[in-house]
Amino acid sequence: LIMSIFNNTQIAFADKTDSQLKKAYWMFKAIEQPLITNVGISALNFTVKNDFPFVTNIVKQTLFEQFCGGETHEESMKVVKQMFKHHVGSIFDYAIEGKAEEIVFDETCEEIKQNIKFAEGNPAIPFVVFKPTGFGRIEIYEEVGKKVELTTSQKEEWARVVKRYEEVCQMAFDRNVVLM
């Protein structure tokens, strides 16, 4: 039954309007063109980096609408419930890319804990996911992976990373939520 949604477009797209389907069709047609995709990514990165005011609305009405359920747990639940009617689970993914500040790692840890609380007892959200780089700098993982002697500040930094893992894993265990 679960795979039937991927084999039968009537099931897969039953909840979509003609307008939503046409929009998705043209978006995917554009994405399959490497030149358009590369130019689009470059333009998006440039406009985001330079704080162009209109970018947020364009992204929300295109990519975000197609690939995301919402900006908050509550907002996303409409999509989660709709998908679960067809036996498709959802995940709440929270990621901060390229940040290296301890406060950001702590905020990410707290956000993952909120995701765990929200997923608890909800079969429509079968697991919670996070990236290791949300808990610490890639460089500290590399140093630990090389098994080199860490400096005092690196040891303290690694201890904070480990503490974030322990907090999140313990909470997930206590609430019977799968982590990935």
Residue ranges with predicted function:
Residues 2-177:
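Alpha/beta catalytic barrel-like cores
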Residues 180:
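Conserved catalytic palm subdomain of right-hand nucleotidyl-transferase polymerases, strongest
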